[in-house]
């Protein structure tokens, strides 16, 4: 019964976190020597991305029982699936992380250092006339954009293409595997910074772009007409 505009508002507010993430990434290079900037950025970005995997892993678990101190909130009732009529505490997935978010915000306020801004608003707007701005934007959409987008729809894609309500009707649940995509991506991002420091970021961006193109072509081929468990394993 929740209005759609409420969900959009909540999504927008959560997006502030994504904006803050993108905003502080460029400043990392100011606090580390250039020879270690790839490692620093990889660790910072990878650990940040790891939060997506954590919520997708523990979220379904937290929804299965009433949290201590929060049982005064009425649970929802499942209306379809194998557990019709059973209680589910959907709000637990958000409430559990509220204290951690507050702690992180306080620590950031105390310990993070600001990068001095020397350019005025007009000077900052000059980036839009620089072709490199648009080249980097395209690269960012290709890499992090695809990572975050596919991580968000990974579970839904499994349900729609292979799950019990799909034409294949396999006994698989997207929520069981949803955390794997962002987990693998985050680990690779954390560990690959050191290789970028040694070989350069351009070559690895090129390699990742080629690898993503090949992988996407393979996924499209599998999802075009999946026939059973074999296609599911290939997709995974």
Segment roles from a protein language model:
Residues 19-33:
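Intracellular juxtamembrane helix-capping segments at the cytosolic ends
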